[in-house]
Amino acid sequence: MSGQADIALIGLAVMGQNLILNMDEKGFVVCAYNRTVAKVKEFLANEAKGTNVIGADSLKDMVSKLKSPRKVMLLVKGGSAVDDFIQQLVPLLSAGDVIIDGGNSEYQDTSRRCDELAKLGLLYVGSGVSGGEEGARHGPSLMPGGHEAAWPLIQPIFQAICAKADGEPCCEWVGDGGAGHFVKMVHNGIEYGDMQLICEAYHIMQSLGLSADQMADEFGKWNSAELDSFLIEITRDILKYKDGKGHLLERIRDTAGQKGTGKWTAIAALQYGVPVTLIGEAVFSRCLSALKDERVQASSVLKGPSTKAEVANLTKFLDDIKHALYCAKIVSYAQGFMLMREAARENKWRLNYGGIALMWRGGCIIRSVFLGNIKDAYTSQPQLSNLLLDDFFKKAIERGQDSWREVVANAFRWGIPVPALSTALSFYDGYRTAKLPANLLQAQRDYFGAHTYELLGQEGQFHHTNWTGTGGNVSASTYQA
């Protein structure tokens, strides 16, 4: 029968399959398609057996089975695969039909596709989908953006299948063009930062001689307080996990992979001129971890400090680590929201920052109680320039900063790398410093490159000094350093 499906989904990897089953469970008829048609038959005969999911053996067949306006969702690898499918779909669709990209696409690609498809009368949505396989099946966080005219058409489906937090759907329209995928990219960057901070806390505790079970207990305590979050919870579970050979974690090779979204966030921060230092360090930490053979060799020839990791009051220091982790986490999110604010300004997106925090409250990897505090901050002050200036977070850092400084200082003394904890502290101190040494930096630039400088109290007026008496008096306009 033609025209019976509410939506089609292309891409039957685990995420795609689980999203289809989620939609089916919520009462929507889904048409499943995969480039390898045999996979469609296999899915219908196994995971989707007994459901209302239907299959298609070609894109033309798939489109014919959709109700109008047609809605087609792609869950395929970002890049050329998305463009290939769009190219094949365009001749089969009509004006007003919707194409949704639910993969990890670069936001610039999403903006480009929006512009191209708008000329053809087609609606395009780039939606972040977070929560992994379990989230896709039972309720992900969804971050749709693109052509806003598509939102009323997909809203009933998206808000039915997404996670809920305090009864509110973890899905709302984000903004035009690539806004949805940009917000998802920042989400993933923050995820990198959260994971790195937790790893540094683990490394310090391990260096202090705590066993896996003791560390698991500590993370369990933290998860019942202000650090309550999915990542803290799974860290506890990972530390407790045993197989036939004992604790598994210590046998896992210490080299971390990455799919690129953290790197995209760091690159975007540089492009927009926003100091998202913690996420950058989290990305570089993964790069450093990949140098396993070099690190093993260096460990035998490069000497560290003679001071061993030990404290007089372990209970207090473990509490210090908790506070350090919490304070650094605040900085990480503050930086992420700074990046979204600057991107929104340049791209003319109308982002709802409180709404974004709510979208991340459930279903996604960075879900935590902490996000409720961020939502409250932006709800009470929609134009808040930085989370650090919100009373709740300002007081939290005031309470925890002595512990934070103690942990970072001791880690340095003991030779334990804490790039995320320390760069967060440096950012905090830099942000609260009224006068930084950038005056010297600008003088240096003027000395060797005649780049000019402004004087205090004379902002907007640019001066150049002939520092040596032998150089010229003309300021530079091309050479930049």
UniProtKB/Swiss-Prot annotation:
Gene Ontology biological process terms from the UniProt entry: D-gluconate metabolic process; glucose homeostasis; pentose-phosphate shunt, oxidative branch
A UniProt-annotated Pfam family: NAD_binding_2
Active-site positions on this chain: K184, E191
Protein's pathway: Carbohydrate degradation; pentose phosphate pathway; D-ribulose 5-phosphate from D-glucose 6-phosphate (oxidative stage): step 3/3
Binding positions for NADP(+) per the UniProt entry: G11, L12, A13, V14, M15, G16, N34, R35, T36, V76, K77, G78, N104
Catalytic activity: 6-phospho-D-gluconate + NADP(+) = D-ribulose 5-phosphate + CO2 + NADPH
EC number: 1.1.1.44
Sequence positions that bind substrate: N104, S130, G131, G132, H187, N188, Y192, K259, R286, R445, H451
One Gene Ontology MF term: phosphogluconate dehydrogenase (decarboxylating) activity
Subunit annotation: Homodimer.
Function as written in the Swiss-Prot or TrEMBL entry: Catalyzes the oxidative decarboxylation of 6-phosphogluconate to ribulose 5-phosphate and CO(2), with concomitant reduction of NADP to NADPH.
Name of the protein: 6-phosphogluconate dehydrogenase, decarboxylating
Designated gene of the protein: Pgd
